[in-house]
């Protein structure tokens, strides 16, 4: 199974980018993992927040395939423990999911079109974090899930 983290905008923080890259490097031992960046549409434009969400939404939908198993990372989504998330990924792997896409929207969230197209949502926390931090947290959780599934001593209960 290939896991894609589809994100809007690049990471400005070198520290966050380096930490995320470290987990991506570690993940290569377990699963194909890729971060796909949609260019930030607000640069050089004067769009309203709704127009920006719509523009980002069109870009997100254009990158999704009909066969993808897609999940929005959204504060209103279902919360999982690390053990539950690892079981969720394992189920996807065992049911033959070829490409699993997790999407982090832009600063104003997801457009109505994206929300209608993608039913599954996961929340990493009820708290609000920067999108750059969510990239790191999510990548670490995927790595943690892989170590749980492989019975490796990274996660402690």
UniProtKB/Swiss-Prot annotation:
<dbReference type="InterPro" id="IPR029026">
    <property type="entry name" value="tRNA_m1G_MTases_N"/>
</dbReference>
<dbReference type="GO" id="GO:0070038">
    <property type="term" value="F:rRNA (pseudouridine-N3-)-methyltransferase activity"/>
</dbReference>
<keyword id="KW-0698">rRNA processing</keyword>
<keyword id="KW-0808">Transferase</keyword>
<keyword id="KW-0949">S-adenosyl-L-methionine</keyword>
<feature type="binding site">
    <location>
        <position position="73"/>
    </location>
    <ligand>
        <name>S-adenosyl-L-methionine</name>
    </ligand>
</feature>
<keyword id="KW-0963">Cytoplasm</keyword>
<feature type="binding site">
    <location>
        <position position="105"/>
    </location>
    <ligand>
        <name>S-adenosyl-L-methionine</name>
    </ligand>
</feature>
<comment type="subunit">
    <text>Homodimer.</text>
</comment>
<feature type="binding site">
    <location>
        <begin position="124"/>
        <end position="129"/>
    </location>
    <ligand>
        <name>S-adenosyl-L-methionine</name>
    </ligand>
</feature>
<comment type="function">
    <text>Specifically methylates the pseudouridine at position 1915 (m3Psi1915) in 23S rRNA.</text>
</comment>
<comment type="similarity">
    <text>Belongs to the RNA methyltransferase RlmH family.</text>
</comment>
<dbReference type="Pfam" id="PF02590">
    <property type="entry name" value="SPOUT_MTase"/>
</dbReference>
<dbReference type="InterPro" id="IPR029028">
    <property type="entry name" value="Alpha/beta_knot_MTases"/>
</dbReference>
<keyword id="KW-0489">Methyltransferase</keyword>
<protein>
    <recommendedName>
        <fullName>Ribosomal RNA large subunit methyltransferase H</fullName>
        <ecNumber>2.1.1.177</ecNumber>
    </recommendedName>
</protein>
<dbReference type="GO" id="GO:0005737">
    <property type="term" value="C:cytoplasm"/>
</dbReference>
<dbReference type="InterPro" id="IPR003742">
    <property type="entry name" value="RlmH-like"/>
</dbReference>
């Amino acid at each position: 199974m290939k896991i894609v983290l589809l994100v809007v905008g690049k990471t400005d923080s070198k520290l966050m980018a380096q930490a995320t890259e470290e987990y991506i490097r570690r993940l290569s031992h377990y699963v194909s993992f890729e971060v796909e960046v949609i260019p930030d549409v607000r640069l050089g434009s004067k769009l309203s927040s709704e127009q920006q969400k719509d523009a980002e939404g069109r870009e997100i939908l254009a990158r999704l395939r009909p066969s993808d198993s897609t999940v929005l990372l959204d504060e209103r989504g279902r919360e999982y423990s690390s053990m539950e998330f690892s079981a969720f990924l394992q189920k996807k792997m065992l049911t033959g999911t070829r490409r699993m896409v997790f999407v982090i929207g832009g600063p104003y969230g997801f457009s109505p079109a994206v929300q209608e197209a993608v039913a599954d949502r996961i929340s990493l926390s009820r708290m609000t974090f920067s999108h750059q931090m969510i990239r790191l947290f999510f990548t670490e959780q995927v790595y943690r899930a892989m170590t749980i599934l492989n019975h490796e001593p990274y996660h402690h209960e």
